[in-house]
């Protein structure tokens, strides 16, 4: 029995993805988790994507699933059943290896190794790339998708003016300087195979500690979902994932640090380097699948916002783009890009429903989306400057399934 449908393909990537292109889980995990884990140390039959951290490997699976509109069962034998054989080679996995090598060769020969051609370049949610332009598309209204890298144009609002407006809108520099921690509670709804609601707790401690804990108390056999960063190390534990919990060492670690720092608006000017402002644009709320929208009927969807754009680099050069509401000055979206051998991997966090909490504006609605899933979080309470147990930011306790 499948744990997902094709409409939940991206969630399926995070649920069980044990492999590119062919993989089975090894048994010696716990001791190795204290060190950076490479894909070939954890999975079997890794022929192409060797030498990359496990978190970057999982993100690579997300790129493939997104580009071809696949789920795990399209490439892995009996995926979604008790009889799954991750290590078995299939024609599609063999073909995928060849395609990864082909893309690398194209980029090396034509673009100096820069990732100008990826799976998404040609496939665009199709198994086989479209080779003939449909006339409806040619003569219809073009869909202009923004580039990852923002172009700096003279005459735009300065970075300082945008960030100063955000600081003032969030409560002002003096009040923000007094924010040392906060704890929030509410509900979260997962995507696809992670559908269903859970209780959520978010804990943050200045300057760079953050944890999101989602408790699925009504789901028998499902463990808790945890994303934690303690200022140096990051951990993820996802229900139904073949890895249980694992330590972040690749791009997701850099992203976790940025997420934690952005929890405290007063330090916005210290988070990114090589920072620049791009042209203002319009963004629209991320679409919600039925598995989420049906359980959050009071959450408005499809709203558009005119925004100012700021982009810079986080730890180890990770590319981060921030979108600020032109009217209010508040942060509406964080879009960061991780690395993989076959292209950038986007993670998007949308912020909405800002409310005053002891003089500071904080978002009560958060949508966290990545290539492997989407969490829709609605908070009902935020408490500021409260004691927080440091253990919340560290390695998760052993998996507690029900």
Predicted regions and their residues:
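Bacterial N-terminal signal peptides
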Residues: 11-24
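Mature N-terminal segment immediately following signal peptide/propeptide cleavage
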Residues: 36-77, 159-186
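N-terminal cleavable signal peptides for secretion/export
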Residues: 50, 140-201, 398-402
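Gly/Gly-Pro-rich "capping" loops immediately C-terminal to redox-active cysteine motifs
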Residues: 51, 80-105, 131-145
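The canonical Cys-X-X-Cys-His
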Residues: 69-79, 116-126
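N-terminal mature ectodomain segment of secretory-pathway/periplasmic proteins
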Residues: 167-242, 274-292
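Gly/Pro-enriched, hydrophobic low-complexity segments
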Residues: 219-220, 297, 301-400
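Acidic/charged, solvent-exposed loop-and-adjacent secondary-structure segments enriched in E/D, K/R, S/T
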Residues: 235-266
């Amino acid at each position: 029995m499948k744990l997902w449908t094709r409409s939940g393909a991206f969630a399926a990537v995070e649920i069980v993805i044990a492999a590119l292109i062919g993989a089975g889980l090894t048994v010696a995990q716990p001791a190795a988790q204290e060190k950076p884990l490479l894909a070939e140390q954890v999975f079997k039959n890794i022929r192409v994507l060797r030498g990359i951290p496990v978190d970057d490997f999982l993100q690579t699976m997300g790129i493939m699933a997104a580009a071809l509109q696949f789920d795990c069962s399209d490439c892995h034998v009996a995926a979604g059943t008790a009889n799954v054989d991750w290590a078995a080679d299939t024609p599609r996995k063999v073909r995928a290896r060849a395609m990864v090598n082909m893309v690398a060769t194209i980029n090396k020969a034509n673009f100096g190794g820069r990732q100008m051609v990826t799976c998404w370049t040609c496939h665009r949610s199709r198994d086989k790339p479209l080779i003939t332009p449909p006339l409806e598309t040619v003569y219809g209204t073009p869909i202009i998708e923004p580039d990852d890298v923002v172009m700096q144009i003279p005459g735009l609002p300065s970075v300082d003016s945008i960030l100063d407006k955000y600081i003032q809108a969030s409560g002002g520099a003096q009040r923000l300087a007094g924010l040392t921690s906060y704890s929030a509670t509410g509900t979260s709804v997962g995507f696809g195979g992670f559908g269903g609601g859970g209780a959520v707790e978010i804990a943050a401690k200045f300057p760079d500690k953050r944890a999101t804990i989602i408790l699925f108390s009504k789901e028998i056999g499902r463990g808790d979902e945890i994303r934690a960063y303690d200022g140096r190390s990051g951990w993820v534990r996802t229900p139904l994932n073949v890895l249980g919990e694992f330590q972040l060492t690749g791009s997701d670690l850099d992203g976790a640090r940025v997420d934690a720092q952005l929890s405290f608006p007063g330090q916005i000017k210290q988070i990114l380097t090589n920072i620049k402002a791009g042209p203002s644009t319009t963004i629209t709320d991320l679409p919600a699948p039925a598995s989420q929208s049906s359980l959050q009927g009071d959450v408005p969807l499809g709203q558009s916002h005119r925004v100012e754009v700021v982009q810079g680099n986080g730890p180890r050069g990770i590319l981060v783009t921030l979108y600020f509401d032109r009217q209010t000055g508040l942060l509406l979206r964080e879009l960061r890009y991780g690395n993989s051998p076959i292209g950038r991997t986007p993670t998007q966090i949308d912020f909405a429903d800002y409310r005053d909490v002891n003089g500071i504006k904080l978002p009560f609605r958060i949508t966290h989306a990545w290539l492997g899933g989407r969490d829709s979080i609605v908070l009902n309470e935020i408490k500021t400057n409260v004691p927080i147990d440091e253990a919340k930011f560290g390695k998760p306790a052993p998996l507690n399934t029900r």
